[in-house]
Amino acid sequence: VLIQEDKLSVIDFDDAGFGWYGFDLAVAVWDRLDFTATGCHFDIAYEALIEGYLEECPNTEDIINTIPTFLLMRTMMIIRWIEDRPEAGYESFIPVLIKASIDQAKDLELLN
């Protein structure tokens, strides 16, 4: 559970990857990315998560460094989830998510 002022958010560990702690952390903050909604304050959520994680698990910078890659993977997984479930009615989000994944890949220097 993440707590922000008077709001609680639940981490859905069903989406967590076995043994990939960076993916677990990416899932926890993915819905705070700017393209998912307005006013999500990703930087604040990300920094708070990292600070808390490093406090509990010091010397895990190698895990922290994987989070941007896992954020990209999560975005691509959501695209696939939407494509597989047209009855859910989220197709209109696909172009936004594709653009976001391209931007994430560029930030990771995977694309020019």
Which ranges hold each PLM region?
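Active-site acidic catalytic loop and adjacent metal/ATP-binding pocket
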Residues: 1-23
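Short, surface-exposed linear patches
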Residues: 14-15, 31-34, 49, 100-103
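ATP/Mg2+ or Mg2+-diphosphate-binding catalytic cores
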Residues: 40, 77-112
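Generic hydrophobic, helix-prone segments enriched in Leu/Val/Ile
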Residues: 20, 41-51, 63, 96-105
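All-alpha amphipathic helical-bundle segments outside canonical DNA-binding/catalytic cores
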Residues: 59-71
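Short charge-dense sequence patches
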Residues: 1-6, 49-52, 56, 104-111
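Residue-level detector of alpha-helix boundaries and kinks
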Residues: 10, 14, 37-38, 64
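Active-site activation/catalytic loop segments of kinase-like enzymes and analogous catalytic loops
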Residues: 22-58, 72-89
